[in-house]
């Protein structure tokens, strides 16, 4: 009794294909990997014996619609990504009653069309226009980064090379103020550094240690000082250079009155007769250099006219002249002939004075008195 043939089911192998890529090198690697995988399965390359060969019909293989067995048997189909497709599995008699398997999916998957990227700002404006809302205000202009701050570009943006960047503007190198001092010390004639203590006095700059009294070398920084002949002096040394009062002997510091080659305090320069302060008025001196006011001096030392017996002094701002004759003093207006009262001249002429026995006469009266034997 013949044994019943065994049922054999050929297992089908499904290969999940990766989506195609644009990189040619990667596609070739995938095709080579698929071919190597096929070579690694020798059982698929061996011919399979169909147990139904004794029945008298050859098994039929399924072919896709629109293609014949002749076109499929002679050429091994290749995928678009460079891989090799597996041959269709062999079927037995029991498998012929099964419905044909669904057609395999297409190896080529079309790439979606690339759409231009939509900026978020334009999509936001279009949405606002549909809602009848005003568009947002434009973004502020980019501000130049401050010095010392680092700017990081957003991800996905390439940083331009150094050749593409514009050269930085050339800024003049400026030194801080007073770093290089042009002031020179008025005493040692060396530069005054801005970091050193300095004193400004008498329109010049000095080191603090150089601004001293020129007599006793006392430090004058922050102290009261005096200037004499362009030299700074402390108060004691300055007072030693001042003049002493010609009457009291004290130093004259404020207002000074100079007379007789000396200096006086205003209260010390007074008249010796009335003790009135003369100040800047006119004064007179006697033989002992004593000071008198003009009025007291004339009252004491002015000559007295022998005719009117009044002192001969200037009046109403006019100078007064005295005439001396025979040891007597006369005013100009009092110098007349005692007989005819004619004004006598001081010149030795006919209109001059012709005295006779201590009397003043003109020439005609003098001759008349002499002839008469009078006086």
Swiss-Prot record:
Gene Ontology biological process: cell-cell adhesion; regulation of cell shape; regulation of integrin activation
Disulfide bonds: none
Region (FERMT2-binding): 278-375
Spans annotated as Disordered: 40-176
Location of the region described as Filamin-binding in the Swiss-Prot/TrEMBL record: 1-69
Biased composition (Polar residues): 60-83
Predominant place of localization: other
Alphabetized InterPro entries for the sequence: Znf_LIM
UniProt-annotated location(s): Cell junction, Focal adhesion; Cytoplasm, Cytoskeleton, Stress fiber
A GO MF term: metal ion binding
Residue span, LIM zinc-binding domain: 183-244, 245-302, 303-372
PROSITE patterns: LIM_DOMAIN_1, LIM_DOMAIN_2
Keywords: Cell adhesion, Cell junction, Cell shape, Cytoplasm, Cytoskeleton, LIM domain, Metal-binding, Repeat, Zinc
Subunit field text: Interacts with FERMT2, FLNA, FLNB and FLNC. Interacts with NKX2-5.
Protein function: Serves as an anchoring site for cell-ECM adhesion proteins and filamin-containing actin filaments. Is implicated in cell shape modulation (spreading) and motility. May participate in the regulation of filamin-mediated cross-linking and stabilization of actin filaments. May also regulate the assembly of filamin-containing signaling complexes that control actin assembly. Promotes dissociation of FLNA from ITGB3 and ITGB7. Promotes activation of integrins and regulates integrin-mediated cell-cell adhesion.
Protein name: Filamin-binding LIM protein 1
Organism annotation: Mus musculus
Gene name of the encoded protein: Fblim1
């Amino acid at each position: 009794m013949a044994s019943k043939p065994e049922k054999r089911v050929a297992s089908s192998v499904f290969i999940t294909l990766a989506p195609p890529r644009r990189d040619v090198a990667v596609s070739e690697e995938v095709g080579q990997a698929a071919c190597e995988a096929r070579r690694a399965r020798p059982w698929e390359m061996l011919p399979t014996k169909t147990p139904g060969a004794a029945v008298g019909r050859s098994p039929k293989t399924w072919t896709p619609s629109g293609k014949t067995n002749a076109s499929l048997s002679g050429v091994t189909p290749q995928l678009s990504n460079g891989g090799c497709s597996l041959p269709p599995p062999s079927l037995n008699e029991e498998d012929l009653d099964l419905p044909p398997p669904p057609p395999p999916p297409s190896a080529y998957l079309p790439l979606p069309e690339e759409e231009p990227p939509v900026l978020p700002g334009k999509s936001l404006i279009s949405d606002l226009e549909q809602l009848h809302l005003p568009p947002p205000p434009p973004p502020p202009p980019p501000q130049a980064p401050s010095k010392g701050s680092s700017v990081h570009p957003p991800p996905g943006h390439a940083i331009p090379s150094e050749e593409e960047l514009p050269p930085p503007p050339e800024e003049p190198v400026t030194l801080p103020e007073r770093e290089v001092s042009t002031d020179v010390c008025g005493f040692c004639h060396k530069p005054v550094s801005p970091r050193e203590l300095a004193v400004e006095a008498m329109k010049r700059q000095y080191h603090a240690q150089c601004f001293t009294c020129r007599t006793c070398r006392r430090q004058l920084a922050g102290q009261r000082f005096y200037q004499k002949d362009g030299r700074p002096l402390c108060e004691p040394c300055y007072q030693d250079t001042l003049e002493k009062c010609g009457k009291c002997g004290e130093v004259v510091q404020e207002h000074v009155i100079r007379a007789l080659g000396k200096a006086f305090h205003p209260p010390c320069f007074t008249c010796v007769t009335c003790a009135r302060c003369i100040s800047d008025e006119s004064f007179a001196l006697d033989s002992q250099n004593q000071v008198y006011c003009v009025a007291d001096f004339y009252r004491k030392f002015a000559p007295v006219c022998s005719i009117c017996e009044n002192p001969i002094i200037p009046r109403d701002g006019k100078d007064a002249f005295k005439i001396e004759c025979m040891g007597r003093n006369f005013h100009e207006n009092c110098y007349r002939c005692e007989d005819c009262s004619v004004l006598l001249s001081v010149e030795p002429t006919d209109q001059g004075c012709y005295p006779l026995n201590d009397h003043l006469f003109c020439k005609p009266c003098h001759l008349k008195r002499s002839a008469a034997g009078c006086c």
